[in-house]
Amino acid sequence: PGSAMLYRPRDVVSGDFYFAARAGEELLFAVADCTGHGVPGAFVSMIGLQQLREAAAHSSDPGEILSALNRSIRRALHQEGDDELRDGVSSVTHVKDGMDIILCSWNPATRTLRCAGANRPLWLLRDGALESIKGTNAAIAGFTPDEQIFETHTLVLQTPARLVLSSDGYADQFGGEKGKKFMVKRLQELLRSTATQTLEQQKRALASAFDDWKGEKEQVDDVCILVVEL
């Protein structure tokens, strides 16, 4: 499949990352948004990417991968047994650290798409409309318990479609005439209105709209948007 990526770290290093891998006949791809940005965000993102690769080597089911990822990152950050500390004081470093992520698997032979999200949706552009497939209402690691299940959604795409996987940094950017957030609705409308353009044109439109909105204001968060054409 064709793809385009808008990747704008707020600092030199980023808490957002993207991922792609083959799993047999299927292609896996993801966008993740780790706690924080800069060095702390990059630290969690480095661990997240490593653990995601390991989980994806054992399964191609997005929900199963996210459940395994939750357990392995909690172990890597020494968060096991910290659930009871939610309202107390924890001496464990990185107890709150975690990530939001949207993960997809695509089988081109059967045109079957599976996806699972941790606090992130998948947006599907087809036939002039944008559909939102909600993720599970839980993060990876942080205060999420080991036994958390992440739901896999399955669709068969009969017609061409574009998938949009995004962190929250674009929609959360302050700017415009009144210094307000860009907001998800405005981003969705921009994606919908540019869905018939080439991937490169759509990427340029996203970049231009972001820069125009931000103006002279500081970038508030890492930005990562992956568009995949199926």
Predicted regions and their residues:
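… and, occasionally, acidic/histidine-rich disordered N-termini of signaling adaptors
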Residues: 1-164, 217-230
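C-terminal catalytic subdomain
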Residues: 66-67, 102, 153-165, 170-230
